[in-house]
Amino acid sequence: MTKATDEGTVIAVQANYYWVRLRNVTSQPLLCTRRTRLKKVGQKVMVGDQVRVELPPSLLLHGRSNTAPVPMVAEGDLGAIAKVYPRRTVLERPPVANAEQICLVFALTDPPLEEWQLSRFLVQAEATGLEISLCFNKQDLVQETDVKFWGDRLAAWGYAPIIISVENRWGVEKLQEKLRSRISLMAGPSGVGKSSLINLLVPGVEQQVKNVSGKLRKGRHTTRHVELFDLPHGGLLADTPGFNQPDLAVEPAQLIHLFPEARQQLTGQECFFKDCLHRGEPDCAVGQDWERYEHYLTFLEEVLAQQNPENSRETDTGLKTKTGSDGQEYDEPKLETKKYRRHSRRQEHQELQSFCEQTDLDNLQEDWE
């Protein structure tokens, strides 16, 4: 007998269970397992996956939602993911499939906008290959001259930031339009207003979290797991805990292409050396008169050190840096292994006993001779 099926999007993964937003049968997410044959072939299921689901009898018979917060889930209430459709994009950190864009959120102030941190986020976002939407929050706390300064500065970097204020909802409509009908990831440092922005973009987000997590965890808004939330005008949005402390997991030769202003310089021309890393090599196509060139050099050293950790270790000077009560740093000699280690009393007694025994043996041998 052919089982009834529907297609949908995986919106959350928790242990061995998957929440799927179905397209036709119900407007509520359905709790599912993964078919054994998918496990056997090593087919993983990720948030954002497009899947085909075998529907549970209870849903077909009663037409009810499967997300009521009950303490146990009966076998007949579970759907089963039977197929995972090919993915258009895949991210490992955070683990999300089929994402289309990353929305980076920063604050213009409180905390102050820090150019190195912003640059690092942008570089890692570029490495995903996804479209980037840059959003500056807290417009209501700065002067118009500050807004213009950062707008002009980011334009030179190759970006057109969306300026918003969650507090007075200024500029939010433009961001909503960018998110419409797409799977988007939201990332950024702490304290910039991401949670408040998500609450504004996704009305009832706390209830969505409660529904999705009612059977499996306590039902509070946490970003330890990636979850997709429905946007009112279409599309899905995820907060991304794995992206909020970005690593530069790129190849050295790839790094220059993650800076739009440098990428533009390489359009239609090449460096003389194929392995050029754009550090002043002869006939390099990339100039040095762009603002983030220093960022590029610093990030490049970090990437090179990751590839050759044995070469990046500094020679041991025998000193270690410590911070005093006055906040000043100072060097203190390291204690060499075993050289300055105090012997334990037990060890001293053992050595003394061994010495006495050896002395007695020597004396005994002398008496015998």
From Swiss-Prot:
Cofactors, names only: Zn(2+)
Superkingdom of the organism of origin: Bacteria
Q: Where does Zn(2+) bind?
A: 271, 276, 278, 284
Residues annotated for GTP binding in this entry: 137-140, 188-196
The main location is cytoplasm
A Pfam match: RsgA_GTPase
Q: What does this protein do?
A: One of several proteins that assist in the late maturation steps of the functional core of the 30S ribosomal subunit. Helps release RbfA from mature subunits. May play a role in the assembly of ribosomal proteins into the subunit. Circularly permuted GTPase that catalyzes slow GTP hydrolysis, GTPase activity is stimulated by the 30S ribosomal subunit.
> What assembly does the database describe for this protein?
Monomer. Associates with 30S ribosomal subunit, binds 16S rRNA.
Q: What name has this protein been given in UniProt?
A: Small ribosomal subunit biogenesis GTPase RsgA
Q: What species was this sequence derived from?
A: Synechocystis sp. (strain ATCC 27184 / PCC 6803 / Kazusa)
